[in-house]
């Protein structure tokens, strides 16, 4: 029978007992404890540099005389992943400490800031210099490392950190549990256990199916109980003293539960918790053995998962018994040792508003009867001038702005501001202008393409009509220009107007090719992208540069050029992927659009030209004609032609090359500015084609 092997070092029981540790499970420590300590030191330094709130001076981090917390709870972690786990763990510790000293409302607000920062898809804007922006910058590099190491498990871990722990950790925190079952349920949420297990999976590079999770869940439940209660046992004195001194506003502990519900003294309550810990470890072993007996052929992977869960229980227990975080109260002199300086581990329908008044039919406009020799004013002549309601004008704009968004442009603005340092008031105006122009372009694009859907919702012109949509889009352009003229510099206005001309120029060729069924060359298509899609990215950059006081400014031209091309060609490719359910299956084919895969196919394989042009010729090209998509069979055939021509492989290869060029360009700018930009790297990572699903094989029929 294949046996489990270990990279970690076994801690002998005689050594562990010196700290007051009483776990019944074997303890192991990662052989690269130095990596965990280095990551913890980096976190403390990053927090001090970015947050500037001094909180790192009063927080005890993962360091301990017996080893770093992450080295003890993830002893079998892949070495390359240990550092990022330690970094996230210390983020959790300092966040937990801060929350204990806050009211529930303030703690929930701080949870919200960290939740947004840990969301790769978050598009909310934060003012430069705000705590929310500092938090986002602090965690961006860590998130990028997680995704780079293991995209699937990294995103799963970050989602659990954000959506499971932060979203619910302060829920019901004003309610006192009355039973151990209630308490463990609350502590599992508040104590971060729902994120710990995805972190353990990430540490091992181990994906576990839902069926496998269900099979081992009783064992994991026992492990969870052991983890939580060990923390309660060893942290009681610290938390009780912090509550008594006013440093903390509340205490959540099994010791407190037994004091409240059973009337026990503190010593007896702690002894009861100790018995519960030993019982939980015994249950863990019994449930594990029962599973192995009932499932003799259980995969070695699950045995390793269960074994590492047990090692996490014992490692956490050992660390809690020795770490300054839980034991500094024993020696007040250790309070001067913060996480940065403390000795590290031994391993080193809409109507207008009514008029301002209703004219009475028995009076004239001036309120007196007209004389016989004066001409009488007609009612129409007497109506006053007033400004009508803007509801009809604003409704299409509000509709499209409320749709889900990738938020790439807002994220890019925040990332570029790492280098340009535009003041927050002007940055808010820039974001508002870019969002207004982008939404206006979406309204016009859908109308000009006769597209019925936008992000899974009816396109604006379907709901409000063509004319009203055009009118609103035009108004949005006017409003954007007005905002720049009022709030930003003359150079920003010049940049806006010049790039708007480019946007219209690029769109003109996209429309020309569709209307005339003329397929452009690859070079012509890329040039169109540079003006249409790239123009928006170039616009936001040029406006930011006009508002920045940084001198000299780096050359961002190639960055925005590549970003526009990458963004559009990726969108062309993804239109054939499953995300198209939001806009319609292969909607680019319905629109008769010469996207990048089609351009490559027709330019390099003219034998397919007749098929595509014949299909495109059948589509309605007049905006007043209802959109009529190609049949599913037609789209399958054309997709198969693209597949056979190698268009999809070429598109992926093109995107891969551009992604590499973008990474090189970011490196160049970081070296030139002397400032790393994890937010920009994360923005690119969210759009990465690394590991992206390839479009499946579809065989075209040979019949005509």
Curated annotation (Swiss-Prot):
Annotated residues for binding of Mg(2+) 3: 445, 449
Entry-linked Pfam families: polyprenyl_synt, Terpene_syn_C_2
Keyword Metal-binding annotated: yes
Positions with a binding annotation for isopentenyl diphosphate: 406, 409, 438, 455
Region called Prenyltransferase, residue ranges: 330-688
Span(s) of short sequence motif DDXXD 1: 96-100
UniProt EC number: 4.2.3.-, 2.5.1.29, 2.5.1.81
Start and end residues of each stretch annotated as Terpene cyclase: 1-329
Reaction equation(s) it catalyzes: isopentenyl diphosphate + (2E,6E)-farnesyl diphosphate = (2E,6E,10E)-geranylgeranyl diphosphate + diphosphate; isopentenyl diphosphate + (2E,6E,10E)-geranylgeranyl diphosphate = (2E,6E,10E,14E)-geranylfarnesyl diphosphate + diphosphate
Cofactors required: Mg(2+)
Sequence motif NSE/DTE, residues: 231-239
Positions that bind dimethylallyl diphosphate: 454, 532-533, 568, 575, 583, 593
Top-level taxon: Eukaryota
Keyword Hydrolase found: no
Residues at which Mg(2+) 1 binds: 96
Alphabetical list of InterPro entries matching this protein: Isoprenoid_synthase_dom_sf (IPR008949), Polyprenyl_synt (IPR000092), Polyprenyl_synt_CS (IPR033749)
UniProt-annotated stretches for the region Disordered: 361-380
Residues reported to bind Mg(2+) 4: 445, 449
Subunit structure, as described in the record: Hexamer.
Domain remark text: The conserved DDXXD motifs as well as the NSE/DTE motif are important for the catalytic activity, presumably through binding to Mg(2+).
Membership in a protein family: In the N-terminal section; belongs to the terpene synthase family.
Protein name (record): Preterpestacin I synthase tpcA
Species the sequence originates in: Cochliobolus heterostrophus (strain C5 / ATCC 48332 / race O)
Phylogenetic lineage: Eukaryota, Fungi, Dikarya, Ascomycota, Pezizomycotina
């Amino acid at each position: 029978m294949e046996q489990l092997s270990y990279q970690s070092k076994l801690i002998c029981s005689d050594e562990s007992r010196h700290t007051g540790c009483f776990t019944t499970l074997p303890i192991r420590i990662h052989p690269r404890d130095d990596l965990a300590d280095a990551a913890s030191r980096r976190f403390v330094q990053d927090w001090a540099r970015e947050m500037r709130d001094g909180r790192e001076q009063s927080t005890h981090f993962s360091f301990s005389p017996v080893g770093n917390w992450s080295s003890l709870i993830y002893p079998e972690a892949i070495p390359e992943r240990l550092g990022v786990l330690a970094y996230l763990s210390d983020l959790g510790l300092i966040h937990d400490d801060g929350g204990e000293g806050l009211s529930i409302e303030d703690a929930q607000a701080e949870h919200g800031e960290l939740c947004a920062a840990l969301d790769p898809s978050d598009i909310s804007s934060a003012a430069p210099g705000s705590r929310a922006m500092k938090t986002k910058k602090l965690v961006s590099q860590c998130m990028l490392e997680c995704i780079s190491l293991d995209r699937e498990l990294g995103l799963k871990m970050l989602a659990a950190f954000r959506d499971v722990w932060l979203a619910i950790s302060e829920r019901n925190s004003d309610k006192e549990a009355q039973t151990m079952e209630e308490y463990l349920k609350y502590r599992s949420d508040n104590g971060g256990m729902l994120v710990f297990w995805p972190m353990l999976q990430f540490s091992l590079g181990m994906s576990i199916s839902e069926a496998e999770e269900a099979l081992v869940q009783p064992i994991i439940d026992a492990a969870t109980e052991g983890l939580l209660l060990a923390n309660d046992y060893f942290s009681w004195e610290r938390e009780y003293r912090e509550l008594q001194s006013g440093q903390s506003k509340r205490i959540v502990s099994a010791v407190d539960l037994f004091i409240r519900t059973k009337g026990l003294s503190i010593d007896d309550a702690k002894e009861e918790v100790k018995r519960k810990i030993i019982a939980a470890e015994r249950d863990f072993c019994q449930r594990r053995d029962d599973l192995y007996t009932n499932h003799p052929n259980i995969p070695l992977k699950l045995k390793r998962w269960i074994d590492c869960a047990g090692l996490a229980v014992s490692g956490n227990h050992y660390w809690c018994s020795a770490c300054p975080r839980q034991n500094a109260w024993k020696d007040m002199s250790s309070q001067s040792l913060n996480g940065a300086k403390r000795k590290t581990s031994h391993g080193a329908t809409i109507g207008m508003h009514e008029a301002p008044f209703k004219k009475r039919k028995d009076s004239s406009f001036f309120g007196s009867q007209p004389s016989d020799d004066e001409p009488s004013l007609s009612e129409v002549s007497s109506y006053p001038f007033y400004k009508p309601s803007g509801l009809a004008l604003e409704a299409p704009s509000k509709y499209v702005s409320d749709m889900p968004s990738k938020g790439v442009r807002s994220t890019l603005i925040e990332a570029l501001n790492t280098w340009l340092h535009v003041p927050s008031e002007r940055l808010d105006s820039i974001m508002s202008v870019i969002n207004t122009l982008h939404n206006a372009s979406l309204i016009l694009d859908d109308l000009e393409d006769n597209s019925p859907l936008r992000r899974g919702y009816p396109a604006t012109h379907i709901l409000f009509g063509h004319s009203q949509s055009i009118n609103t889009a035009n108004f949005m352009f006017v409003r954007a220009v007005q905002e720049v003229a009022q709030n930003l510099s003359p150079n920003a206005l010049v940049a806006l107007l010049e790039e708007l001309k480019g946007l219209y120029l690029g769109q003109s060729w996209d429309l020309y090719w569709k209307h005339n069924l003329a397929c452009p060359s690859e070079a012509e298509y890329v040039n169109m992208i540079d003006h249409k899609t790239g123009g928006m990215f170039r616009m936001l950059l040029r406006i930011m540069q006009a508002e920045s006081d940084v001198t000299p400014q780096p050359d961002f031209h190639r960055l925005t050029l590549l970003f526009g091309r990458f963004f559009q060609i990726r969108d062309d490719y993804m239109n054939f992927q499953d995300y198209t359910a939001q806009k319609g299956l292969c909607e680019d084919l319905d629109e008769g659009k010469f996207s990048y895969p089609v351009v490559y196919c027709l330019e390099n394989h003219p034998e397919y030209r007749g098929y595509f042009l014949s299909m495109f010729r059948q589509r309605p090209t007049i905006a007043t004609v209802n959109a009529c998509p190609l049949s599913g069979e037609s789209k399958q055939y054309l997709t198969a032609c693209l597949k056979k021509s190698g268009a999809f492989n070429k598109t992926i290869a093109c995107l891969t090359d551009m992604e590499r060029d973008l990474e090189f360009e970011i490196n160049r700018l970081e070296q030139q500015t002397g400032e790393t930009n994890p937010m920009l790297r994360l923005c690119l990572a969210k759009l990465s084609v690394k590991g992206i699903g390839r479009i499946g094989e579809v065989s075209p029929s040979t019949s005509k």
